[in-house]
């Protein structure tokens, strides 16, 4: 039920940016839609209308880090907007592979929907993901998260 997550894709941001960068995000959204969780995504050119805003950068300068998601929360504990940054290169200045970029897109979309990191390396939400398809555990976490009333779950203190 509900409405789709609206995604805005900001072009550019990295010298390596190309139209296929948007394809990684679209494919990542398709992977979550295919997980049969009742989630779906639409794409908008208007960032003010978007729930999730993707932008690109060359590198985070931090090892193989490929993505970061910054969440904005409502007072009632709902994610109101997510800002996702994806890098095209690692700190060693090597281009990320297509699989790494797809995995990062799927992983960061998980964060944008409110999912935390997983301790299981076969999950797309594992911090150093090698996976491009949400696992059974990832899907179960989404089901649990979306079954709870807003504000009943809080991120652990850092």
What are these regions (language model features)?
Residues 1-19, 71-76, 151-156:
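Disordered inhibitory propeptide/activation segment of secreted metzincin zinc metalloprotease zymogens
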Residues 5, 50, 121-122:
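Residue-level recognition of the N-termini of beta-strands and the immediately preceding loop/turn
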Residues 13, 58-60, 130:
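Short, internal active-site loops enriched in acidic
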Residues 16, 20, 130-133:
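A general boundary/transition motif marking the beginning of the first structured unit of a protein
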Residues 19-106, 112:
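Metzincin-family zinc-dependent endopeptidase catalytic domain
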Residues 70-100, 116-158:
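Metalloprotease/metallohydrolase-associated module, dominated by Zn2+-dependent proteases
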């Amino acid at each position: 039920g509900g409405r789709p997550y609206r995604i805005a894709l900001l072009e550019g941001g990295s010298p390596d940016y190309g139209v296929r960068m948007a394809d990684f995000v679209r494919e990542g959204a398709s992977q979550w839609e295919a997980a049969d969780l009742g989630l779906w995504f639409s794409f908008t050119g208007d960032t003010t209308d978007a729930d999730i805003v993707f932008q690109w950068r060359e590198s985070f300068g931090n090892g193989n880090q490929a993505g970061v998601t910054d969440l904005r929360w409502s007072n009632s504990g709902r994610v109101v907007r997510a800002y996702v940054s994806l890098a095209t290169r690692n700190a060693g200045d090597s281009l990320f592979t297509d699989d790494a970029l797809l995995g990062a897109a799927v992983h960061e979309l998980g964060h944008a929907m409110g999912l935390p990191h997983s301790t299981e390396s076969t999950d797309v939400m594992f911090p150093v993901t090698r996976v491009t398809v949400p696992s059974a555990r990832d899907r179960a976490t989404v089901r649990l998260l979306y079954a709870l009333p807003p504000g009943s779950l809080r991120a652990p203190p850092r």
